[in-house]
Every structure is written in structure tokens, then in C-alpha cells.
Amino acid sequence: MSKKSIIEREKKRKSLVKKYKNLRNFIKKEIKNELNFFEKIFLNFKLQKFPRDSSPCRLHNRCYLTGRPRGYYRFFGLSRHIFRDMAHYGLLPGVTKSSW
């Protein structure tokens, strides 16, 4: 299981991304639409003034139960280990072990 501090840091990043999402998208649209080079530089400078963790590319998918960052199944929100255990015990409806 991941450290609680790392999981909390990821939660904080998610909230910052959510908070600044509309502003970031608005400024990015303005940068694409602007014809003046200096205005583009100014808008880019404004974009850089946002908190570093408000950028969505700094988010990392983590398992809902354990916080494990690798082997993550997006559809279920679980890591491969937890997914396997839950599927084995029948806790994921519709998931069956394949056999052919």
C-alpha cells in the first residue's frame, strides 16, 4: 500500500486541477485565437503563473483501495492485484475468468 501522504498529495492535485480547469482552458483558447505575438507571450506568462499542480498532466491514476500507481485498470479504478482478487471472489459483477 502506498504512503498516505502520497495518496493525499494526489487528492490535492485532483482538486487543484478541478479548480483551475476552466481558467486554463479559457487561456489556452485565447492563445490559439490570438494573432498578436506579444499577446500570446503575455497569455502564456499568465498560464505559467498558475500552480504547478493544477496541470492535468501531473495527475497519476492510482488504485482506489491501495493507492498503487502501476498496473491500473481505468474502467474499474483498481490495480491489477486487487482486480484479480475481487474478480476471483466474485465482487465484480460480470467479470469471469476466461477459458477456451
Swiss-Prot record:
Keywords: Plastid, Ribonucleoprotein, Ribosomal protein. Pfam families: Ribosomal_S14. Disulfide bonds: none annotated. The keyword Oxidoreductase does not apply. GO terms for biological process: translation. Binds 16S rRNA, required for the assembly of 30S particles. Belongs to the universal ribosomal protein uS14 family. Part of the 30S ribosomal subunit. This is Small ribosomal subunit protein uS14c. It comes from Euglena longa.
